[in-house]
Amino acid sequence: MNADGATQQPGGGVSFEKTTLLWSLPWDADWISAVSFVGAKHIAAGNNLGEILLWELPEKPEPAPEPADKTKSSSGEKSERPIYSAPLPSRQFTGHSNVINRLLCAENRWLISASNDHTLRYWDLQASTGAPAKLVLNARTIEDIARNKSSGRKSPPPLEVEVRTQPAAKTIQGKEWIVGLSMSHDQSTLITGDDAGQVALLNRAAGTEKKRWQVKGWAYAVAISPDLKQALVSERYPLVFDSGRHTAVKLWDAAGGTVQHDLSKEFKDMQIAAAAYSGDGKTLAIGRGGEGDGKIFLLDPVTGKKQRELAPIHQYGVTDLCFHPDGKHLASTGRDTVVRLWNVADGKLVKELGKPRGGQFKDWFHAISFSPDGTRLAAADMAGFVHIWQFGG
């Protein structure tokens, strides 16, 4: 066992054979759209209202009480239940006014967010907090029941919590929705994409711009290679009518802002919603989003050629991808409310977390994040939870 209780395989790897749902953190103000570990002991999540909360994960958690009802999923199986009582959030990061599209962490200290309010913002966990504020974590549920009195549902008591507020330490102002955000493996460089087709490389620590170029559609999914020489950018126009739609996926020379490989024909009519480079730079994973089959492809970044396609698919589309810190495994999730762990070397499915809930509007998982040591995984659930699993413990 390591310090977090996860079983270590020979050579220091994490075992995925046994997984445990530790916590399901409730937060139902609006769709939870982004999630990130901030170091090993904190988790941050953002929602469609532009709110961001931070939880401190207890070292000695309290066991969860036995539920009065034995709720089953839509498939008839018993729902997986967390073994510990959920801690309450301790901080609210204030300043955003629109959807939080991405969250990431640098140096186990800095939380960085991208929003439809045209800004990137940085928060320092070591900074002092401000005034207290009161939140109702189940506000959306209460409001929905009040609006639909004919449903006969009984309104739950408000789940009130007091948090300390904290403004951003740094704000980078853009001009359009910032829909894409990713960070290089060495944490030195950010890549962003907006809905005007602007792609930008930034010095992560300073927040200063290094390079910018233009693509045709929304710069939707973006990623930068570990050597900082290549960038993946997927484009789309999310219009209703087929005649107005545009999709593209290209590999760019990050220094010159010129196309190295245009993969648009290979992935014709696919909205690539997620992308990630492996830590060694030898594999690029991309996932098809939208409402189609959520296919995942592993590519050779040097040639742009497809190495393999992973199966099974995420029904109704992929929403996020991330490599495990060991570089040997990939996590994926989508609108089917399932997280899958894959062996990158052979493309085989290693583990599946969560259960399908019956359709693409049955509480997607929007985003996933590994803890720095790779012993835990978090998923942002549209239903109003942040789920945290432990591997091996």
Walk through the language-model features, giving the residues of each.
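WD40-repeat beta-propeller superdomains and closely related acidic/aromatic-rich repeat-like regions
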Residues: N2-G393
